[in-house]
């Protein structure tokens, strides 16, 4: 929750507890043992309903959550799949740094190409 320019985690309010299912210590964890065999780098992500556009916001999120990346829909996928006991995997390709508003510096084409490459490798590994 954002209030007066500061971010307050929902767990610091009376809305929910950080260990209420499907949360584990405030995180939506994918503990699927089948994922351990995949040779993919892991990242800690936070999901926001906005685009972070300042260095102050970026630092607040890094300090509060030690997050590697920011998404706008990742938590919804995790939440629903955990609630419904549906196996899932979220693969991300990074196009820009948090807070970078100059879209000419974003590398969307390269990010999509890298994602497609990794998906082809993953599909090949899973089907062979």
Report residues per predicted region.
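Juxtamembrane helix-loop transition sites at the ends of transmembrane segments
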Residues: 45, 94, 111-113
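His/Asp/Glu-rich mid-to-C-terminal helical/loop segments that flank catalytic regions of hydrolases
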Residues: 98-128
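A C-terminal functional module that forms or caps the active site or interfaces directly
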Residues: 50-99
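Gly/Ser/Thr-rich active-site loops/lids in small-molecule metabolic enzymes
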Residues: 1-5, 66, 70, 111-115
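Mid-sequence, gly/pro-rich, charge-dense loop/helix-turn segments that line enzyme active sites
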Residues: 1-65
């Amino acid at each position: 929750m954002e209030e007066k320019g500061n971010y307050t985690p929902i767990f610091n309010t009376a809305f929910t507890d950080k260990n209420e299912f499907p949360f584990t210590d405030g995180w939506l964890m994918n503990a699927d043992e089948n994922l351990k065999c995949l040779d993919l780098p892991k990242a800690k992500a936070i999901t926001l309903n906005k685009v972070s556009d300042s260095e102050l916001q970026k630092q607040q999120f890094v300090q509060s959550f030690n997050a590697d990346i920011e998404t706008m829909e990742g938590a919804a996928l995790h939440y629903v799949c955990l609630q419904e006991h549906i196996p899932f995997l979220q693969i991300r390709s990074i196009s820009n740094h948090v807070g970078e508003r100059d879209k000419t510096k974003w590398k969307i084409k390269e990010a999509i190409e890298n994602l497609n490459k990794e998906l082809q490798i993953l599909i090949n590994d899973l089907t062979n």
